[in-house]
Amino acid sequence: MAQQSLIYSFVARGTVILVEFTDFKGNFTSIAAQCLQKLPSSNNKFTYNCDGHTFNYLVEDGFTYCVVAVDSAGRQIPMSFLERVKEDFNKRYGGGKAATAQANSLNKEFGSKLKEHMQYCMDHPDEISKLAKVKAQVSEVKGVMMENIEKVLDRGEKIELLVDKTENLRSQAQDFRTTGTQMRRKMWLQNMKIKLIVLAIIIALILIIVLSVCHGFKC
């Protein structure tokens, strides 16, 4: 990945940009701000393409986290960067200063943090990609679990059915254990019978050999 794949970032409350950082000059800042004005307010992730660059947004709880990246950076690295920024920002300002801060008033405090996160993500692309894949898998599992729970809670009979099913499974498991014990006992008895029969045959063969060699009992 190119060393300068992430070129601009900001954090906004609504449409008010509280902190931003870039080492470059260009109209990407105004384009990013224009996109911010048109973003849906619902929690989500958005990516827009423009002239070889991507404008990536993470919207959560009234705050928007943005990063402009070169197209070759893909989507995973920019989105992982936004997640890191969101976590750091919430730790520092969650439920406090960020709720009333003025435009660009957090530049001195948090601008350097944006730069640090940018540099880290650009310097450790492999690590970021691995973490992103793990988080994606976890999110997918959480999504499936939540969906299933919501489906169950929609109808009371489904919950009852699950309880009934569980009871049936318990009873089936008990029956299986009982049957298994009986089967093991039966197999043990069969094995013992076979062993006794084989032993009797061996003894009989030995007796026959002894009798034939000794001409009866005249040894």
UniProtKB/Swiss-Prot annotation:
Q: Which residues cross the membrane?
A: 197-217
Name the membrane topology term.
Single-pass type IV membrane protein
Instruction: Alphabetically list the UniProt keywords.
Output: Cell membrane, Coiled coil, Endosome, Membrane, Protein transport, Transmembrane, Transmembrane helix, Transport
Record topology, Cytoplasmic segments: 1-196
What InterPro entries does this protein map onto?
Longin-like_dom_sf (IPR011012), Longin_dom (IPR010908), Synaptobrevin-like (IPR001388), Synaptobrevin-like_transport (IPR051097), V_SNARE_CC (IPR042855)
Asked whether the UniProt record includes Transferase among its keywords, one would answer: no
Expression sites by tissue: Expressed in flowers, leaves, stems and roots.
* Start and end residues of each Longin domain: 10-114
UniProt-annotated location(s): Cell membrane; Early endosome membrane
Which of the residues are on side Vesicular?
A: 218-219
Protein family: Belongs to the synaptobrevin family.
The protein in question is named Vesicle-associated membrane protein 721
The scientific name of the source species is Arabidopsis thaliana
